[in-house]
Amino acid sequence: MSTYVPIQTITLGSNSATVDFTGIPQTFTDFVLVGNFTTNQSAPFRLLVGNNTIDTAANYSMTQMAGTGSVTESTRSSNANFIASGYINAAGRSIWQMHFMNYANTTTNKTVLIRYSTDVSASQSANARVGLWRSTSAINCIRLETNASPQVFESGSTFTLYGIGSGSPKAFGGDRVVTDGTYWYHVFTSSGRFEPVTNLSC
């Protein structure tokens, strides 16, 4: 069973053309970035990643599939300086999810799955993209940036990073069972049964 562990949330207190996450822990198998945001201008936005510094070289590629229920399309870009992460419509709120797989691995190139939708009635669509960073370096920093001035992510937009750890708890029981990526915590709000499923040491 995989577990989502909140790492960091950024809520914009003012308009910004970039959103940066740095010092991403290397203790998870994957991580997921969820964005819930608005913009002042309908335009694409970009994803860049790196190890200690953001890579702005032509080391990215992207494949997209999209559909509205009546129309479908696909596009591809390669040898780009960023991953084109989708089109933001200024008329509504956008919900984005980016899933970075094996991000701490140092032997393979890095893949990210991007899914998003908009709540604009005139252009409702579902979109999926696959991005590739051609580097075997681990990812410990990421950047979202708007396409060009004067486009910005608007104040109040939120971006949350979750780590995904593999594994499962070594016991059953508790009203809530949570993990910080290293340890499991069984919370009892009343009396209950704690039942280990393996030998435990203390």
Indicate residue ranges for each PLM-predicted region.
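Surface-exposed molecular-recognition determinants
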Residues: 1-193
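Extended Gly/Ser/Thr-rich low-complexity repeat segments
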Residues: 197-202
